Each structure stands twice: as structure tokens, then as C-alpha cells.
A protein has these predicted regions:
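Extended non-catalytic accessory segments flanking core domains
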Residues: 1-276
Length: 276
């Protein structure tokens, strides 16, 4: 599989590897990842690739843990190599290979976001990885809609909050922030799903910025202009640590203090009866 990184595209190739993650389910990614067993893997290069099988395809076969042989066209989609246009069912060679591909330890920060470094995300693209560090939820803006969390080494600060705009220090911190974070996704392709972390998610049990995650693992991929880890069904879920960002208790009201209240009418829409 590693040879595909330099192979001519729009050509047909036959590959053999172990299925590490299968996203052929409703609102999934219509395909799966296949990776070379650890004993045959090459160093400092990706040993995995995504196999795209659209919902309209009649091709079937293979499940997580199977070593398979398949033949497809090599192409690039959203800056990620993939095999598509499979014409035959997937052939299973060995159905007991799940333990032959172990997650690779992936630590932040990256040395680079391009392929010029042995510790760049491109080096691990499509592979099964684990994040051994305790990472902080630095952004949850897209969590409710897309199931995305930005994880980082500690809290990240906007560079111009600390340094003058366009200063060398601000530019250096901006670059450091980019190398020190990664998106942890939910493995689905549709919007507005029920958030899956923490367990029993609710208004009283939500996931806030400043919380931490331990032992996250999944497939490292590039999607929607960002490096992210997609969870794998059946593998361990990350541990959510909430005690690191405690909320202040309610302050007792002082009768001598004045409280100021306001009401935002910017989005106070009351139908077709005019405004207000």
C-alpha cells in the first residue's frame, strides 16, 4: 500500500491489507480503510488507504479485522488518496487479522503539516492511531452540528490577544497553534446528530471547552481542509475528564449591589406581522 503514494493516478491497482475501519453505514463515508499489517509495513510513510464504495455500488465483502485483496482505481479526493471504481467483490484472505494492525502512537505537536517531515500528519494518513497525551478541548463550536472537537496541548490563545498584530511573536504563536491541535470527529457525514461524548450527553452533562480527553484513537485522515481522527466502531471510546475546568458556584446576591440586565432584539423575529 505504501507504494501507492508515488504511483501514477487514474490507473488500476491491486492491493492487499487489513480492514481497520468500516464506514459503510447510514450517513457514513461510503467506504473503509485498509492498512498493511505491522510486520510488513514500511517506516516513515503511510501504509493505509481509503477504499470508496458508493451506496449505489453492488460491490460487497470484507469487515474490520479481515485481510482482503481488492482492485480499484487510484485517485485523489479532498487531498486524500483513495481507491474507487471497484468492479469485483472484496476477497477475504484471512478473517483473523485484527491484532496484526495496532494503533500507532501519535503525539502533538506536529513538526510540520506537510509531507516534508517524518512527524507530519501526512506520514500517518489513513492509518490507525492513538493519541496517548491528555488533550484539552480547545474548541467545540462545531460539536453540536458536525460532531467535531478541536483537541490541543492545553488551551490555545489567539495570538493578537498576547502580541501586536503581524508581530513575529504573533506569527510564531499562530503557527505553533496550528501544529498543536487536531480535530476529533464523530465518524458520520451528516449534520445535527446527537453528540456522542460524554456518555449520556444532555444539557446537564455537556462537553465544555477546557475539558480534557484521554486515550482517543481512530483513523487519521484529511477531510474538509483539516486533519482529524475518526473514531472506529467497536474500539475504546476516549475518557472525558471534566474536573479540570470547574465552574464557579453561584455568587450570593448582595442587596446593596445593582444588577444590569439587557435583552438582544437583533434576532427577535415574530413572523410575518412586521417588526417589532
Amino acid at each position: 500500500i505504501a507504494d501507492l503514494s508515488t504511483a501514477a493516478q487514474n490507473q488500476t491497482y491491486t492491493v492487499r491489507g487489513v480492514i481497520t475501519a468500516d464506514y459503510r453505514y447510514a450517513n457514513g463515508f461510503s467506504g473503509f480503510y485498509v492498512q498493511t499489517p505491522d510486520t510488513k509495513a514500511r517506516a516513515n510513510i503511510s501504509n493505509a488507504i481509503f477504499v470508496y464504495i458508493p451506496n449505489s455500488s453492488a460491490v460487497k465483502g470484507g469487515q474490520v479485522g479481515d485481510e482482503v485483496i481488492l482492485r480499484g482505481r487510484l485517485t485523489t479526493y479532498q487531498n486524500q488518496l483513495q481507491l474507487d471504481q471497484l468492479q469485483q467483490d472484496i476477497q477475504t484472505c484471512n478473517s483473523n487479522m485484527a491484532n496484526q494492525v495496532q494503533p500507532i502512537s501519535l503525539e502533538l505537536p506536529f513538526a510540520s503539516l506537510t509531507g516534508g517531515s517524518t512527524h507530519s500528519p501526512q506520514r500517518y494518513q489513513g492509518m490507525l492511531v492513538k493519541l496517548p497525551q491528555t488533550l484539552t478541548v480547545s474548541e467545540n463550536y462545531n460539536y453540536g452540528r458536525y460532531g467535531e472537537l478541536s483537541l490541543s496541548l492545553g488551551r490555545l490563545y489567539i495570538p493578537t490577544n498576547l502580541y501586536p498584530a503581524l508581530s513575529p511573536e504573533a506569527k510564531a504563536l499562530a503557527q505553533k497553534n496550528l501544529l498543536s491541535k487536531i480535530i476529533f470527529d464523530d465518524g458520520y457525514n451528516n449534520q445535527n446528530r446527537t453528540p456522542w461524548l460524554p456518555t449520556n450527553f444532555s444539557a446537564a452533562n455537556t462537553l465544555r471547552s477546557g475539558y480534557q480527553l484521554k486515550n482517543a484513537e481512530g483513523i487519521l485522515e484529511y477531510r474538509f481542509n483539516g486533519w482529524r481522527v475518526q473514531p472506529v466502531l467497536g474500539r475504546n471510546q476516549p475518557e472525558v475528564i471534566t474536573q479540570t475546568n470547574p465552574r464557579q458556584s453561584v455568587i450570593t446576591k448582595n442587596a446593596n449591589h445593582i444588577r444590569v440586565a439587557s435583552f438582544n432584539v437583533l434576532n427577535y423575529d415574530n413572523g410575518a406581522t412586521g417588526f417589532p
